[in-house]
């Protein structure tokens, strides 16, 4: 780095191993100067956005270019397991990212996964953790934590001021069920009942080995991150294989492959919002123990637990990266490398809105929405490098690059209305 004029910062595998995170992108926050990391939401598996040295455009994306094992990627780093990453290099300015042209105008994030480089022996490594998440701060609402009389006093004063003393005898002031619950001191803390402790678990196993001629690596990873509201969750399975064969000291070849399978449950719309609006004097349960749809007849907000059961938002994503290379070094300091890499990713987003939801009001027939996208990207790079140093003072480093890239993107959307009551978004496949 001392020979570079551009701004480059790196995060190594050793640094990554010390951090506990479900999204590799979050490891850059606060550790790389000039890099801002923002999550779109706190739901498990939510997207993460990176800005390098601030906002460059008000009309277009400010996302940097991601290059994973030599292949420009559209998917960011969410599908990667931090245990599989060798290094992350962030190129911040125009001089350091010039090789990528206009695509690198917002900076470049280069991710290199672990490959086969061990020449002797055999090692098996395991890393993992299990953790719990709990809400650290729940807003103090009027009448929460069993203090329902505080809400009753507030509501009484509000109605007197707005409608007069006579309004307290109106049936829409307090329902018979609310009066019964107040009489017996039965109050419901909606936010605390809807929130829950959540489990996060991650396990990674890797094996490396080799001889003088052959090196290999293999890894498996599993991550499950549950949310603190409803059935929100993120699940990821990863696998990687690397092989390198050395014909001689001058000539070698190798392959690297990476596969990631991701499933995200984004939970229900409106459930948490509804919990903020419902008073502690109403219950989510009917007398027979089943869930009520309208907990309070005078409110437009439905039972959040019913919303969770009847509104599904799910995403299924797959990612595959395969690369093969040949490298030849005819003389000391001069090397030629040819690499071809193929990346394929697909994602399917589906949403189901049942009859018993806030949007349908318990009256209209269910509807479903499905969005699907597929990306195929291949790159062929041919690189000639000459590196020579004279008397430990003068250094010459020259690089010649010829690259060919092709991208193919396909997508579709569909929506279905009036679907059977007990179906889901898979009904419109």
Predicted region positions:
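Short, small/polar-rich motifs associated with maturation and membrane association
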Residues: 1-240, 245-254, 258, 319-322, ...
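Surface-exposed loop/interface segments of Gram-negative outer-membrane beta-barrel transport/assembly proteins
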Residues: 2, 118-186, 197, 227-234, ...
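Active-site and adjacent substrate-binding regions of carbohydrate-active enzymes
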Residues: 333
């Amino acid at each position: 780095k001392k020979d570079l004029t551009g701004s480059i910062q790196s995060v190594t595998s050793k640094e990554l191993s010390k951090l506990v995170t479900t999204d590799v992108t979050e490891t850059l926050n606060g550790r790389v100067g000039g890099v801002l990391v923002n999550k779109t939401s706190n739901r498990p598996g939510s997207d993460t956005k990176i800005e390098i040295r601030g906002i460059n455009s008000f009309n277009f994306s400010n996302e940097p270019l991601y290059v994973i094992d030599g292949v420009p990627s559209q998917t960011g780093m969410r599908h990667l397991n931090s245990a599989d990453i060798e290094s992350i290099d962030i190129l911040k300015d125009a001089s350091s990212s010039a090789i990528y042209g206009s695509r690198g105008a917002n900076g470049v994030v280069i991710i290199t996964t672990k490959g086969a480089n061990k020449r002797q022996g055999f090692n098996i490594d395991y890393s993992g953790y299990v953790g719990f998440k709990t809400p650290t701060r729940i807003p103090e609402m009027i009448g929460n934590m069993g203090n329902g009389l505080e809400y009753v006093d507030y509501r009484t004063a509000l109605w007197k001021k707005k409608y007069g003393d006579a309004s307290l005898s109106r049936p829409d002031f307090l329902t018979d069920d609310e009066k019964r619950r107040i009489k017996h001191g039965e109050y419901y803390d909606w936010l605390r009942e809807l929130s829950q402790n959540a489990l996060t678990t991650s396990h990674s196993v890797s094996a490396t080995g080799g001889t003088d001629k052959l090196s290999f690596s293999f890894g498996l990873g599993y991550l499950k991150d549950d949310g603190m509201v409803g059935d929100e969750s993120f699940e990821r399975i990863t696998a990687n294989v690397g092989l390198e064969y050395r014909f001689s000291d001058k000539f070698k070849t190798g392959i690297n492959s990476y596969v990631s399978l991701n499933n995200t449950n984004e939970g229900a719309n409106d459930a948490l919002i509804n919990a903020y609006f419902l008073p502690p004097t109403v219950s989510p349960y009917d007398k027979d123990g089943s869930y009520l749809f309208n907990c309070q007849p005078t409110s437009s907000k439905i039972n959040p637990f019913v919303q969770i059961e009847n509104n599904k938002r799910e995403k299924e994503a797959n990612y595959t990266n395969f690369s093969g290379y040949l490298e030849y070094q005819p003389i000391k300091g001069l090397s030629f490398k040819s690499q071809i890499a193929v990346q394929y990713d697909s994602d399917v987003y589906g949403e189901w809105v049942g009859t018993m939801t806030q949007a349908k009001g318990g009256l209209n027939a269910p509807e479903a929405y499905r969005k699907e996208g597929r990306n195929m990207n291949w790159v062929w790079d041919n690189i000639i490098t000459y590196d020579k140093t004279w008397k430990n003072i003068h250094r010459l480093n020259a690089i010649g690059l010829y690259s060919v890239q092709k991208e193919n993107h396909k997508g579709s959307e569909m929506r279905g209305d009036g679907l059977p009551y007990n179906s889901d978004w898979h009904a419109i496949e």
